Amino acid sequence: MLKFSTTTTIEIKIAVSCDPALDMTPAEISAYLQGDFDSLKIKQDQAPTYFFIKPLSPADREEIEIKAGAYTRSELGRMIYLDQPDDQKTRAYWHDALSDQEKNAFAQYQSYLNRVYAETAKKALVRIEGFEGNAWDAIQSIKPDAHRILTIAEIVTHIQRISLLGDEGK
């Protein structure tokens, strides 16, 4: 039997791991990002910020990639990005050894990925519980910056999971 894309009319409620109202181990965070909503651990007498997201259709995802620059992104940068080491210290030395052309291509590709993340979040973020106004603008005002970046990354991770995995990913 064929599998069909998940409906884009549902809304999923998520929280992000950097929320101070949560108390989760790295293993619980990983499980939560993979769709195990039972791993969400909230501190007693606390309430996290909830974000409501919707799945994206294949057409939505293609539109996002094109808007972010899919046809003009650096293919050399993509190849270098895929080849980078996992270990942070090793990656630092590896990056330092790249030629200027390779560093530039790598930076261009990372910029493209950042645009994809931003466009994905803008398109699929429906609302933030208890917040009136533009949800994307609210995310841009999260401080410190590390929490803003992590919030966007986790929101996009959830969006990709529910958009690509169908019903079993929700």
Language-model segments: what does each one mean?
Residues 1-17:
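Short, intrinsically disordered N-terminal pre-domain segments
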Residues 24-170:
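Short, surface-exposed, charged amphipathic helix/loop patches that serve as local interaction elements
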